[in-house]
């Protein structure tokens, strides 16, 4: 199960195959955004995790949890990000997004 949750979603893979130029342009934009400021990769993933939590989008939460782990953020640090979100987005939304994070973190 762990390998299934850590791999890229089929929807993403099929999109990049169907629209390689758009996918490449998006990756270029993402790279320029990462390079545009002083935050290191680890901090960038935590910021984007917070945005994903606030957006309430399951795919985004899954993606940012995976990227945070890949950047060296510990599972406990990721869980702490969800606790910090609680007072900003409310308990029910935090619980929903935390459930999505645990899809990936439960095997870490």
PLM-predicted stretches and their roles:
Residues 1-44, 70, 94-108:
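Acidic, glycine/proline-rich low-complexity segments that act as flexible tails and inter-domain linkers
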Residues 26, 46-53, 81-88:
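Short alpha-helical scaffolding segments that buttress acidic/His motifs in well-ordered protein cores
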Residues 44-47, 63:
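Residue-level micro-sites within transmembrane alpha helices that shape
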Residues 54-83:
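Mid-chain, well-packed structural core segment of small domains
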Residues 79-103:
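C-terminal structural segments of small proteins and small subunits
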């Amino acid at each position: 199960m762990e390998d299934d949750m850590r791999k890229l979603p089929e929807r993403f893979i099929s999109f990049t195959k169907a629209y390689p130029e758009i996918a490449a342009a998006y990756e270029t934009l993402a790279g320029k955004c990462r390079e545009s400021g002083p935050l290191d990769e680890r901090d960038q993933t935590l910021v984007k995790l917070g945005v994903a939590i606030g957006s309430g989008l399951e795919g985004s939460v899954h993606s940012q949890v995976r990227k945070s782990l890949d950047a060296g953020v510990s599972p406990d640090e990721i869980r702490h990000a969800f606790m910090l979100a609680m007072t900003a987005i409310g308990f029910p939304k935090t619980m929903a997004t935390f459930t999505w994070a645990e899809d990936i973190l439960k095997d870490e």
